[in-house]
Amino acid sequence: MIIAKLEGVEDAFAQELNSSQPNLFNHMKRWLPDMCPKAYRWVGEMEEIAKTFDDNNLSEKLFHCVAETYMVVEKSILGKEIVEKRKKGKTAEDVTDILARFVSKN
């Protein structure tokens, strides 16, 4: 959703995803806001999965990339919030807007 926003196709992407994969779209809308303050934990999870793949002679690259994405979220204002005291990024749209601005500046 962040890339779609940065590329100016956010509405078209949301409409297509909602039309073709409504369950995934609704899951993403709920999951995105909840994930941000916990991004630091997901970095470690992805690195552990990457190691497991590598240990079993499978490519770990995807999981390193996902970990890097979580690192970006962790560095943003959303990653610094405390779950119980959240003030920003309470909707998927807010998360998308905030992270798109953050990525554009860095």
Language model features with spans:
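Helical "substrate-binding/catalytic lid" subdomain
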Residues: 1-87
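Short, basic/aromatic-enriched C-terminal tail that caps enzymatic domains
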Residues: 85-106
